[in-house]
């Protein structure tokens, strides 16, 4: 059976955008992120806020190629970019003094991808 990739048109647009930015900027992190987002939904990352709290430091830029979920607590001020956020995850990130942004917004802020951590 032929692999079709994601059927969500917004996700397809994001993947094309990531590949284009990777080629324009010469940065491999965006191509890697596009590859991770192309995976089947059941293999896509689902990261809880507690995992971000465990592994991140204050001021880190974290990108999740999937969903951020609200289980656990967050005590660090971090910038988190992801494909999707649950309502509780978005609330906990902003209450801790961090930011929950889209992947496109992260690329606008940091087109070279320096200091970005991919978390799965």
Swiss-Prot record:
GO cellular component: cytosolic large ribosomal subunit
Gene3D superfamilies per UniProt: 3.100.10.10
One MF annotation (Gene Ontology) recorded for this entry: RNA binding
Record-linked InterPro entries: Ribosomal_eL18, Ribosomal_eL18/eL18-A/B/_CS, Ribosomal_eL18_arc, Ribosomal_uL15/eL18, Ribosomal_uL15/eL18_sf
Pfam family name, one: Ribosomal_L18
Ranges in a coiled coil: none
Homology family: Belongs to the eukaryotic ribosomal protein eL18 family.
The name this protein goes by in its record: Large ribosomal subunit protein eL18
Species this protein is from: Pyrococcus horikoshii (strain ATCC 700860 / DSM 12428 / JCM 9974 / NBRC 100139 / OT-3)
């Amino acid at each position: 059976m032929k692999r079709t990739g994601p059927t969500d048109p917004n996700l397809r647009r994001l993947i094309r955008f990531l590949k284009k930015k990777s080629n324009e900027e010469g940065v491999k992190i965006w191509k890697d992120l596009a590859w991770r987002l192309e995976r089947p939904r059941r293999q896509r990352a689902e990261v809880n806020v507690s995992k971000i709290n465990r592994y991140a430091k204050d001021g880190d830029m974290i990108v999740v190629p999937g969903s951020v979920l609200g289980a656990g607590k967050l005590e660090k001020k971090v910038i988190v970019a992801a494909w999707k956020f649950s309502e509780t995850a978005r609330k906990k990130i902003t209450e801790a003094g961090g930011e929950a942004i889209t992947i496109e917004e992260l690329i606008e802020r940091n087109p070279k991808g320096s200091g970005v951590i991919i978390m799965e």
